[in-house]
A protein has these predicted regions:
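N-terminal active-site segment of His-dependent metallophosphoesterases
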Residues: 1-54, 62-71, 80, 135-138, ...
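Generic structural signal for conserved hydrophobic packing positions in ordered secondary structure
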Residues: 14, 48, 76, 85-87, ...
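Catalytic metal-binding/acid-base residues of hydrolase active sites
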Residues: 16, 39-40, 61-62, 89, ...
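A short, polar/proline- and glycine-enriched secondary-structure boundary/capping micro-motif
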Residues: 21-22, 94-98, 134-135, 160-168
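Conserved beta-sheet core of the metallophosphoesterase superfamily
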Residues: 55, 82-147, 152
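Charged phosphate-binding loop/patch that engages nucleotide di/tri-phosphates or the phosphate backbone
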Residues: 143-175
Length: 175
């Protein structure tokens, strides 16, 4: 007899109104989607909802009537594991391990990062929206199985360094 299958959770943040086609493709097949804020427009949530059920929190740049309906924090249970969602991890006002959480999901920094602290996965998928500085455009996927959470960061756009060829006046030859 086999146990329950792993649950796949797509994690996206800081779209700022831009839901890239690459993000839609990367989220296909997930059981649920978490948006960790700075959504930018309600239609982003509508489009994500066509892929899987969405849990979303309000980010510091989310404004308007639609955003006012979103909570600042959210708790969800996936495969027997509690996940705590907020936009800025610096505003975490509880001890996640003591509260029984398996993961804390956040955004805000635009920097993808995952680390385990005291048995709790802290997961920031980075920004899937407009590129900021030289940070990658990314999202994440969580796998929940047998009471454990594992994360993976998926970079959506290839970062290609551009090194222009130097042109000197040498009779039209590139050097």
């Amino acid at each position: 007899m086999t146990g329950p299958r792993a649950r796949a959770v797509g994690v996206i943040s800081d779209t700022h109104g831009l839901l890239r086609p690459e993000a839609v493709v990367a989220l296909r097949g997930v059981d649920a989607i978490v948006h960790a804020g700075d959504i930018g427009a309600s239609d982003v949530l509508d489009r994500l909802g066509a892929i899987a059920p969405v849990t979303a929190v309000r980010g510091n740049n989310d404004r308007g009537a639609w955003a006012g309906k979103l909570p600042a924090t959210e708790v969800l249970e996936i495969g027997g594991v509690l996940l705590y969602v907020l936009h800025d991890v610096k505003e975490l006002a509880l001890d996640p391990r003591a509260a029984g959480f398996g993961a804390v999901i956040s955004g805000h920094s635009h920097q993808p990062r995952q680390e385990e602290r005291d048995g709790v996965l802290f997961f920031n998928p980075g920004s899937a929206g407009p590129r900021r500085f030289k940070l990658p455009v990314a999202l994440g996927r969580l796998s929940v199985e047998d009471g454990r959470v594992r994360g993976r960061i998926l970079e959506l756009l290839c970062r290609v360094a551009f090194h222009p060829t130097r042109v000197r006046s040498t009779g039209g030859q590139l050097q």
